[in-house]
Swiss-Prot record:
Any one Gene Ontology molecular-function term assigned to this protein's record: N(6)-L-threonylcarbamoyladenine synthase activity
Protein name: tRNA N6-adenosine threonylcarbamoyltransferase
Cofactor note: Binds 1 Fe(2+) ion per subunit.
Gene Ontology biological process terms, A to Z: tRNA threonylcarbamoyladenosine modification
InterPro entries: ATPase_NBD (IPR043129), Gcp-like_dom (IPR000905), KAE1/TsaD (IPR017861), Peptidase_M22_CS (IPR017860), TsaD (IPR022450)
Record's keyword terms, sorted: Acyltransferase, Cytoplasm, Iron, Metal-binding, Transferase, tRNA processing
Cofactor requirement: Fe(2+)
NCBIfam families with a match to the protein in the record: gcp_kae1 (TIGR00329), T6A_TsaD_YgjD (TIGR03723)
Length: 348
């Protein structure tokens, strides 16, 4: 009888170090998260106004093994019980990815266990399966983060069709760069969203790029320019109107994300949506998409709020689901294999 598999997942693609343990049942049912631990580098990078790759890599080195110990203790498991060691193969910062790959390969070799490199975006895409109400295939997925904004048709694990993507800045970049223009510090997206709650979203008429383009692509670079222009026009009035400009900026970004997602639903004929990635935690996005989808009779699934950011749980879950689906076999090559640039729709 084939036993369940215990999978250790390691995330180190950018500025969060995450480790998790997932149990994948032999019968193919949804894997179970046993424990996870996460360390954010936000405080370290704040002084620089953004992520410093070298510092990120060094901090991953310091954190990943202690986090592994924490997770094993929380799950009441021994390292020797791990069947597969999974890690984020890409996309991401090359040096940061190599830390996770190196630790995974070292653990795998020392335990004589296979390793499996996981696509970071597939981790986000499948993260709602960690919730109490997991989605069912097929569905439309909105992947929205600091570095990516994509609409995908998802028919199963490893069966992804790109419907549309940003042609310039990602939605998360639009939040962060607009926040920087308003002097809100790092990380900018959450700061802008908090300030927006105090403002009037109708105060400024900002563009909704590509909203009526007839396709499912996004563009946010022009919005950033419009925010800069408006901030300069306000001049000395900016401090008093900053909340209004933040609210108007957030409204423009969310409006485009929601309407493009609805268009993807109509084009595909699907009745389920998954929203994943850091921007998926945005309250306005959730409220507006929930309301619009409720009117259409469409179900919306999100990761738990604490799993919207990068984390090891999504990497362990993606590895478990790929193994269950027979999409990939783990290996004992221990090759430190990473792919800093790696389109999700190229994943078999």
């Amino acid at each position: 009888m084939v036993k369940s598999q215990l999978i250790l997942g390691i995330e180190s693609s950018c500025d969060e170090t995450g480790v998790a343990l997932v149990r994948a049942p032999a019968d193919g049912s949804v894997p179970t998260l046993l424990a996870h631990a996460l360390h954010s580098q936000i405080d370290m990078h704040q002084a620089y106004g953004g992520v410093v790759p070298e510092l990120a890599s060094r901090d991953h080195i310091r954190r990943v093994l202690p986090l592994t110990g924490t997770v094993l203790a929380e799950a009441d498991c021994r390292l020797a019980e791990v069947d597969v060691v999974a890690y984020t193969r890409g996309p991401g910062l090359a040096g940061a990815l190599l830390v996770g790959a190196g630790v995974a390969c070292a653990l795998g070799a020392s335990l004589d266990r296979p390793v499996l490199g996981v696509h970071h975006l597939e981790g986000h895409l499948l993260s709602p399966f960690l919730s109490a109400d997991p989605p069912e295939f097929p569905f439309v997925a909105l992947l929205v983060s600091g570095g990516h904004t994509q609409l995908m048709r998802v028919d199963g694990v490893g069966r992804y069709e790109l419907l549309g993507e940003t042609i310039d800045d990602a939605a998360g970049e639009a939040f962060d760069k607009s926040a920087k223009l308003l002097g809100l510090g790092y990380p900018g997206g959450p700061a802008l969203s908090r300030l927006a709650e105090q403002g009037d979203a109708a105060a400024f008429k900002l563009p909704r790029p590509l909203l009526h383009s007839g396709n499912l692509d996004f563009s946010f670079a022009g919005l950033k320019t419009a925010v800069l222009t408006q901030a300069k026009k306000l001049g000395d009035e900016l401090p008093a109107r900053k909340a209004d400009l933040a609210a108007s900026t957030q409204a423009a970004i969310v409006d485009v994300l929601v309407k493009k997602t609805l268009a993807a639903l109509q084009a595909s004929g699907l009745r389920r949506v998954v929203v994943a990635g850091g921007v998926g935690a945005n309250r306005l996005l959730r409220a507006q998409l929930d309301a619009a989808c409720a009117r259409m009779g469409v179900r919306v699934h999100y990761p738990e709020l604490h799993l919207c950011t990068d984390n090891g749980a999504m990497i362990a879950m993606a590895a478990a689901m790929r193994l269950q689906a027979g999409r990939e076999a783990p290996n004992r090559e221990y090759a430190f294999d990473v792919k800093p640039r790696w389109p999700l729709d190229a994943l078999a």
